[in-house]
Amino acid sequence: MRRVALAATTAAMMFTYTTRALSQADTTGQWRYTITPYAWLTGLSGQVGVGPVASNIDLGVSDVLDMLKFGIMGSAEARKHSWVIAADAIYAKLGAGRTVAFQGETGSLDLTQSETIIQPVGGYTIGNNVWGLDLLGGLRYWNLTASLDVERPRASNEHSDSRSWVDATGGFRFRWVPVTLARLVLAADGGGGGSQSTWQAYGSLGVDPSSYWTLGVAYRWLAVDYNRDNFLYDTTMKGFIFGATYRFK
């Protein structure tokens, strides 16, 4: 039974995960801006269901890439003194099918799914030139559209639905600069509201090839449990992220 899912998405909250030494004290009094396009090579596991039809999901990175029809993601950040505001946005669309057995009959199950995740956050930073701790609060907006089409010799059914909800989140991001051109970031958040629960965690390592750019690699987990009114989306995404941060000067 071929499994389907959603891929290369949420990022919800990579928020310039490898930005350069942002733990430094800002003495200029000016806003500093960064943007980070990135690619999340994620796997997906859990359950997706629309109406009476549900599918277990257990996808590796290669499976998700095969199913991905379109995806785009990126983040932006602004800092002034000890204050920070940031936003992360992800859109992905997947489609796949598989052969299944229905009480002695052979049929097919096709799923098309699109997802948008947008997460604005704001917070306060404490630290010095070597380390920094961001205390963050924000929102995670989800918009999901799923269509499950079951085809078999004697009957066919198609179930589709779209849901949107907002979760409140709180978390932290710890940044450490052990040497001048490298930085380590560890972060986590959790919350809920529109869904039963959501959480994410990631760690990243970045290097600065110039004063304008940081290149980074990270590993990220993002989970959500939404189960309301015959719409089920209980999944965990995890995988490597590759990104490049540009600093405006």
Where are these regions (language model features)?
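Transmembrane beta-strand segments that form the barrel wall of outer-membrane beta-barrel proteins
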Residues: A182-Q196, W221-L222
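Residues on the lipid-exposed face of transmembrane beta-strands in outer-membrane beta-barrel proteins
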Residues: I35-P37, G74-K80, P120-Y124, G137-L139, ...
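Surface-exposed extracellular loop regions of Gram-negative outer-membrane beta-barrel proteins
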Residues: T169-A187
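Cleavable N-terminal export/targeting peptides
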Residues: M1-Q30, K249
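Short glycine/proline- and aromatic-enriched beta-strand/turn motifs that initiate or cap beta-hairpins
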Residues: L22-K93, V177, G190, G243-K249
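Extracellular/periplasm-exposed beta-strand and loop segments of Gram-negative cell-envelope proteins
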Residues: G43-K69, A89-T116, N143-W165, G193, ...
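Predominantly the C-terminal beta-signal and adjacent terminal strand-loop region
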Residues: A201-K249
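Repeated loop/turn-to-beta-strand initiation elements of outer-membrane beta-barrel proteins
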Residues: S82-I85, V130-L133, T180-L184, Y212-L215
